[in-house]
Amino acid sequence: MSRIGKNPVVLPAGVEVTVGEQIVVKGPLGSLKTAAHSAVNVAVEGQNVTVSKVAGAANAAAMWGTMRANLNNMVTGVSKGFERKLQLVGVGYRAQAQGDTLNLSLGFSHPVAHKMPAGVKVECPTQTEILIKGSDKQQVGQVAAEIRAYRKPEPYKGKGVRYADEVVVIKETKKK
């Protein structure tokens, strides 16, 4: 069994945590909320947030580490933020950010316009790079996955939208 839940979450300067029915984390990059699970107790002690199991709860051990990891991600998100980098590989594949909309040319007969949800910003340093930033780790990853799903990297030439750190294994073509 993992012991991630034992470690306290250290609060950096400027980050404030309020515990009630909902746990609210406020920081320089915004505010995030999550529901307090009944199987764990969350307590703020100075500059630390501790998570403890409730005795007798069936899924307390599972939720203990999960709640601690989610709180740590929330604290990191409102203090430093999260970002995900995507690359476009292919002839004529381009991206352009306009406000809260990302316009993509991915070889379809029409351009693809992807609207960003609240709390997520998009930048295009070059025409083939997309940088997704936000304070909610789950939301940043979800938006990146949605954009990648428009044109996943294909296995023969590697064309498509890929994560910057993704390794695409190229298959060899069939020989007679």
UniProtKB/Swiss-Prot annotation:
This protein's name: Large ribosomal subunit protein uL6
Signal peptide coordinates? none
Sorted keywords for this record are: Ribonucleoprotein, Ribosomal protein, RNA-binding, rRNA-binding
Could you confirm whether the keyword Signal appears in this record?
A: no
Q: Which family does it belong to?
A: Belongs to the universal ribosomal protein uL6 family.
Source organism per entry reads Dechloromonas aromatica (strain RCB)
Extract the InterPro entries matched here.
Answer: Ribosomal_uL6-like, Ribosomal_uL6-like_a/b-dom_sf, Ribosomal_uL6_a/b-dom, Ribosomal_uL6_bac-type, Ribosomal_uL6_CS
Gene Ontology biological process terms in this record? cytoplasmic translation
Protein purpose:
This protein binds to the 23S rRNA, and is important in its secondary structure. It is located near the subunit interface in the base of the L7/L12 stalk, and near the tRNA binding site of the peptidyltransferase center.
State how it assembles. Answer: Part of the 50S ribosomal subunit.
> Lineage, please?
Bacteria, Pseudomonadati, Pseudomonadota, Betaproteobacteria, Rhodocyclales
Recorded hits in Pfam families, A to Z, give: Ribosomal_L6
Identify the Gene3D superfamilies for this entry: Ribosomal protein L6, alpha-beta domain
An example Gene Ontology cellular component term from the record? cytosolic large ribosomal subunit
